[in-house]
C-alpha cells in the first residue's frame, strides 16, 4: 500500500508539472494569449488603414474632386484663370 501511495504521489507531481510547465501547459497558454492580443491590435490597425485606402480608391474612381486635390497638393498645379500666391515667412537672423 505504501508503494501505491508513493507511485500516486509521483504521478500526481508529474501531472502537475506537465500542466504548469510542460508543452501546451498553462505557461504556454498565457504566452499565446498575450501574442494573440498583440496580433489583434495589429490587425485592427491594419484593417483601419485598409478601410481608409479603400475609401480613397473609391473616391478617386468616382469623383474628380479627390484627383484635383491631389494634383494641387502633390504636384502644385493651379487651375486655369487662378492666381497662385505663396507667402514666405521672415527668417530669424
From Swiss-Prot:
Keyword Cell division included in the entry's annotation: yes
Gene3D superfamilies: 1.20.5.400
Presence of keyword Thylakoid: no
Key words of the record: Cell cycle, Cell division, Cell inner membrane, Cell membrane, Coiled coil, Membrane, Transmembrane, Transmembrane helix
Coiled coil feature spans: 32-75
Stretches assigned to the Periplasmic side: 22-93
Membrane topology: Single-pass type II membrane protein
Region forming the signal peptide: none
Cellular localization per UniProt: Cell inner membrane
Any one Gene Ontology BP term: FtsZ-dependent cytokinesis
Segments traversing the membrane: 4-21
GO cellular component: cell division site; cell septum; plasma membrane
InterPro entries: Cell_div_FtsB, FtsL/DivIC
Cytoplasmic domain ranges by topology: 1-3
Family: Belongs to the FtsB family.
Function, as annotated: Essential cell division protein. May link together the upstream cell division proteins, which are predominantly cytoplasmic, with the downstream cell division proteins, which are predominantly periplasmic.
HAMAP family the UniProt entry points to: FtsB
Subunit relationships: Part of a complex composed of FtsB, FtsL and FtsQ.
Name used for this protein in its record: Cell division protein FtsB
Species this chain originates from: Vibrio parahaemolyticus serotype O3:K6 (strain RIMD 2210633)
